[in-house]
């Protein structure tokens, strides 16, 4: 088993041929992928944290050595392998609730239309004829992006609370600025009114005094005319 750890997408490559494993590994690395290679379908299931029940070959159980913390974005497997074929591996992955969303691509050196149709109907994303070319691997990026986007969508968005509370903060700041402006206007208006009130007050007093002087007085009693 070989692992490269610095790539964006993580691909699990399955092939019983050492030459074909090395070939697909190099092509995937040129496509900036992290690659894990295994030589059988059973080892692929073991890496995912699954194993076939000895009592029931059709049933899957959790392996004691679980690798579920390692994110796999795509599985590419040879079709013709001893023991578990690529088609069998495809079915096992699609039967697993935890891993059925992982895209699976089948490779084969034999162009058999019925085999290709069966794999695609079972859920394979692509069926490549060997030798696989670098141009073929460009078709894998959209499939790998699906798993990345799904993982990101499942993450909780902590910033949501900040976004919700932000308008309330701005509204409070706006209200406080209005409150600060209002006293300023009131202060200016009061300063402008004060001399006017003083002037009006003087005029009123002068009018009272002049009125008092014009009224006749009898024994210090003012009579209204």
Swiss-Prot record:
Residues where 4-aspartylphosphate is found: 78
User: PROSITE patterns, alphabetically?
Assistant: RESPONSE_REGULATORY
| SMART domains registered for this protein in UniProt | REC
The record's listing under PANTHER family reads: TWO-COMPONENT RESPONSE REGULATOR, TWO-COMPONENT RESPONSE REGULATOR ARR8
Instruction: Please give the family membership noted in the entry.
Output: Belongs to the ARR family. Type-A subfamily.
| UniProt protein name | Two-component response regulator ARR8
Residue ranges of every copy of the Response regulatory domain listed in the record: 10-145
- MF terms (GO), sorted A to Z: phosphorelay response regulator activity
Q: Which InterPro entries match?
A: ARR-like, CheY-like_superfamily, Sig_transdc_resp-reg_receiver
Q: What is known about the tissue distribution of this protein?
A: Predominantly expressed in roots.
Organism, scientific name? Arabidopsis thaliana (Mouse-ear cress)
Is Ubl conjugation found in the keyword set? no
Post-translational modification note? Two-component system major event consists of a His-to-Asp phosphorelay between a sensor histidine kinase (HK) and a response regulator (RR). In plants, the His-to-Asp phosphorelay involves an additional intermediate named Histidine-containing phosphotransfer protein (HPt). This multistep phosphorelay consists of a His-Asp-His-Asp sequential transfer of a phosphate group between first a His and an Asp of the HK protein, followed by the transfer to a conserved His of the HPt protein and finally the transfer to an Asp in the receiver domain of the RR protein.
Please provide, in alphabetical order, the Gene Ontology terms of the cellular component aspect for this entry. Answer: nucleus
């Amino acid at each position: 088993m070989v692992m490269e750890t610095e790539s964006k997408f993580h691909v699990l490559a399955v092939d019983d041929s050492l030459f074909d494993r090395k070939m697909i590994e190099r092509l995937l690395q040129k496509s900036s992928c992290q690659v894990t290679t295994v030589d059988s379908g059973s080892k692929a299931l073991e890496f995912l944290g699954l194993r076939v029940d000895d009592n029931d070959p059709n049933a899957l159980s959790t392996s004691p050595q679980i690798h579920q913390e390692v994110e796999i974005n795509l599985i590419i497997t040879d079709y013709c392998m001893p023991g578990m074929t690529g088609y069998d591996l495809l079915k096992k992955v699609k039967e697993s609730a935890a891993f059925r969303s992982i895209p699976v691509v089948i490779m084969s050196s034999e162009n058999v239309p019925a085999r290709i149709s069966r794999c695609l109907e079972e859920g394979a994303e692509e069926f490549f004829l060997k030798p696989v070319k670098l141009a073929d691997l460009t078709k894998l990026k959209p499939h790998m992006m699906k798993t990345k986007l799904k993982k990101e969508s499942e993450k909780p968005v902590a910033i949501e609370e900040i976004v919700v509370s932000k308008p309330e903060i701005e509204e409070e700041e706006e209200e406080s600025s209005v409150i600060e402006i209002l006293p300023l206007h009131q202060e200016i208006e009061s300063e402008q009114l004060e001399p006017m009130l003083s002037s009006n007050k003087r005029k009123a007093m002068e009018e009272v005094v002049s009125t008092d002087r014009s009224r006749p007085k009898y024994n210090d009693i003012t009579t209204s005319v």
